[in-house]
Amino acid sequence: TTMTGDWNGTRTELAEKGIKFDGTIAVDGSYLADGGYDAHQAPTFGTQFGVGTTLDMQKLAGWNGVTVRALVTARQGESTSLRGIQDPTAPQWANSQANWGRGNSGSRLSELYIDKKFDSGWDVRLGRMGLGTEFNTMACDFQSNAFCAAQMGKWQGKLWYNTPVSQWGGRVKYNLTPELFAQVGVFEYNPENALERHGWNLDTKNADGVNILSEVVWSPKQGLNDLAGSYRLGTLYNTADDAKNQYDVAYAAKTVGEDRSYGGWLAFEQQLTSTGAGRQGLHSFGNFTFHDRTTTAVSDSQQLGLKYYGLFEGHPNDILGFAVNRVQINDRYRDFVNTTRTNPANVQQYNKTLLNKDAEYNLELNYSYYPAKWLMLRPLLQYVVYPGATTQVDNALVVGLGSKFIF
């Protein structure tokens, strides 16, 4: 069910022929109620619009197992993290509004790929896509990007671009069993793709190496307590060798070049109790990332959370959620920043905010309410401890309201 309905039956007719359309508008609203760097400013809103189509080429052209997917997105708005929570010289590591990630953009080509599934268990996908739609995938049932989408794209985001940013590449998946698959992917690394003004950049002239990803995913239908779960283990290897893109974070940016970087993740989602049909009941999830300490300002992160589906009778899709995230700052990077800022000889950096804590912590409590299948409203509270990994900025209390429309 969508906000625009079935278009007098046209939508169903097109779907039966192999043509499906989808569209969403998501709005993240945040207000810094207390603490942070500059509280009590006006609320900010980050908005994402997306419209896409999925073509079943078997129905349209007789191509067995072939699907074509296209998605265009646009993001506009402002960020409470930037405007109120953070000291500009010690940015918050997470962001209160996931839909503000990568800033504003008039429009972007976020997906354009062809996928072929083989009877032998192989699945090949080629084209443009975001890394987080293929690897380290995670639901977005929270507004903070510390709990939304592939966490590798946040903590190693200099190299890893999630949707809405896309890049050329390919992914090969092999289903070893109905519950276990392995996949590898190779994607261009092109910093130009992330720029707000290059949402439709299709050339590779500014590419610098590639991202090589691998992942094993086990999704038992009867795991813990005979309930479904999903477990992911993966790695990232990047081959960029231009010092402006790949450099040692213990020195001034872009001065000591490196020729590789790596990272890894372990993620899970496991249903713990069942109180009805489908997903109803208590679910747990977690995401743990590890990063190259030579080239990455974040050394590791930990995320744990709980979601309860269908807490109230008659609302099986509603979700009560709570999650905690810890972002560990690379001590090599932190020591360099603090040494620079305590040296009077460094006129531009001297006396700027010190990163005097080793981590930032993000918490969110929310309730995702579905008054209709096409509408979600999400009141929420967020609390940020040591924003920017410093005690020189107060802990921040954020009140928010997210919404999503499906049309």
Regions from the PLM with identified roles:
Residues 4-21, 55-68, 120-121, 179, ...:
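Short loop/turn motifs that connect adjacent beta-strands in outer-membrane beta-barrel proteins
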Residues 14, 27, 55-59, 116, ...:
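Residue-level signature of outer-membrane beta-barrel architecture
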Residues 42, 46-191, 296-301, 311-338:
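Outer membrane beta-barrel
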Residues 23-29, 68-74, 124-128, 184-188, ...:
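Transmembrane beta-barrel strands of outer-membrane/channel proteins
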Residues 121, 153-293, 297, 308:
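Signature for the C-terminal beta-barrel architecture of outer-membrane proteins
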Residues 322, 395-407:
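Outer-membrane beta-barrel "beta-signal"
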Residues 201-202, 215-218, 234-262, 269, ...:
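Outer membrane beta-barrel transmembrane domains
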Residues 3, 17, 31, 43-49, ...:
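Residues that define the transmembrane beta-barrel architecture of outer-membrane proteins
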